[in-house]
A protein has these predicted regions:
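Juxtamembrane helix-start elements in MFS-like secondary transporters
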Residues: 2-10, 92, 96
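Transmembrane alpha-helical segments of major facilitator superfamily
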Residues: 7-17, 99, 103, 134
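Helix-to-loop junctions at the C-terminal end of transmembrane segments
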Residues: 20-33
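Structural signature of the two symmetry-related core transmembrane helices
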Residues: 36-50
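Paired small-residue
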Residues: 58-67
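Intracellular juxtamembrane helix-capping segments at the cytosolic ends
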Residues: 73-87
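A late C-terminal transmembrane helix in Major Facilitator Superfamily
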Residues: 86-123, 131
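Multi-pass alpha-helical transporter architecture, strongest
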Residues: 123, 129-151
C-alpha cells in the first residue's frame, strides 16, 4: 500500500468516528446498557484492525469505516462515563486526567512496541496481538466501569 493510500485509509477511519461519536448515546439506549455497547465496540475495533492488516486491500476502506465507528463509539462513551460517574466537577477533572495519562501512556507503548516489532521481524502479527490485548483490557474495564456504584 502506498503512503497516499494509507493516508486515505486513515482519513476514512477518522471521518467515520464522527457519526459514531454523535450517535453513541442513542446506540447505548438501543443496546440496553453502556457495558454491552463498549464490549461490542471494542470487539469491532480489534476485528477491524485485523481486517485492515490481513484482508485483501479491497476490504481496507470498509474495515477503516468499521474501525472509525468502533473507536468513535468507545471514545464518546468513555468521556461520558467520567462525567456520569463523578460526584463533583473536580472529581470529573481528576478522572479525566487519570484516564488521559493512562491512555496516552498505553498509546505510546503500543507505538513503541509496534515499531520494535517491525524492525525485528517485519510482521504485523505482534502489533495485532498487542492491540487485541489492549482491546480486551478495554472491554473488561468498560464492563466494570458501566456497573452502578463503580466509583
Amino acid at each position: 500500500m502506498s503512503y497516499v493510500d494509507a493516508g486515505f485509509i486513515l482519513s476514512v477511519a477518522m471521518f467515520a468516528q464522527l457519526p459514531a461519536t454523535l450517535s453513541a448515546h442513542a446506540l447505548e439506549k438501543a443496546t440496553g446498557g453502556r457495558g454491552l455497547l463498549i464490549v461490542m465496540a471494542m470487539a469491532l475495533a480489534a476485528l477491524s484492525c485485523w481486517g485492515i492488516l490481513y484482508l485483501p486491500l479491497d476490504w481496507a476502506v470498509w474495515m477503516a469505516i468499521l474501525f472509525g465507528l468502533a473507536t468513535g463509539t468507545v471514545f464518546s462513551r468513555g468521556m461520558a462515563l467520567m462525567v456520569e460517574r463523578a460526584r463533583t466537577p473536580s472529581e470529573a477533572i481528576r478522572l479525566s486526567g487519570m484516564s488521559q495519562g493512562i491512555g496516552f501512556t498505553m498509546g505510546a507503548a503500543l507505538s513503541l512496541l509496534f515499531t520494535s516489532f517491525l524492525h525485528q521481524g517485519g510482521s504485523f502479527l505482534p502489533f495485532c496481538l498487542v492491540y487485541t490485548f489492549f482491546c480486551v483490557l478495554g472491554m473488561i474495564s468498560g464492563r466494570m466501569s458501566a456497573q452502578p456504584g463503580y466509583l
